[in-house]
């Protein structure tokens, strides 16, 4: 069974990684985002949320 012989594993792993890097690197580097983020001046709501499990009430003593 050839998978039990670990001698060629490093060569197979490194050659596969090198091939994928050579093929995928130009594709990744040439990628341009389709939706560029825009600077929107929307009013930000600064009110905090009130969660029922974080409210401390004196009736639960």
UniProtKB/Swiss-Prot annotation:
The keyword Metal-binding does not apply. GO terms for cellular component: mitochondrial membrane; proton-transporting ATP synthase complex. Keywords: ATP synthesis, CF(0), Hydrogen ion transport, Ion transport, Membrane, Mitochondrion, Transmembrane, Transmembrane helix, Transport. It comes from the Eukaryota. It is found in: Mitochondrion membrane. The chain crosses the membrane at residues 10-32. Its main location: mitochondrion. The keyword Transport applies. Pfam families: ATP-synt_8. One of its GO terms (biological process) is proton motive force-driven ATP synthesis. It is a single-pass membrane protein. GO terms for molecular function: proton transmembrane transporter activity. Component of the ATP synthase complex composed at least of ATP5F1A/subunit alpha, ATP5F1B/subunit beta, ATP5MC1/subunit c (homooctomer), MT-ATP6/subunit a, MT-ATP8/subunit 8, ATP5ME/subunit e, ATP5MF/subunit f, ATP5MG/subunit g, ATP5MK/subunit k, ATP5MJ/subunit j, ATP5F1C/subunit gamma, ATP5F1D/subunit delta, ATP5F1E/subunit epsilon, ATP5PF/subunit F6, ATP5PB/subunit b, ATP5PD/subunit d, ATP5PO/subunit OSCP. Subunit 8, of the mitochondrial membrane ATP synthase complex (F(1)F(0) ATP synthase or Complex V) that produces ATP from ADP in the presence of a proton gradient across the membrane which is generated by electron transport complexes of the respiratory chain. ATP synthase complex consist of a soluble F(1) head domain - the catalytic core - and a membrane F(1) domain - the membrane proton channel. These two domains are linked by a central stalk rotating inside the F(1) region and a stationary peripheral stalk. Belongs to the ATPase protein 8 family. This is ATP synthase F(0) complex subunit 8. The gene is MT-ATP8.
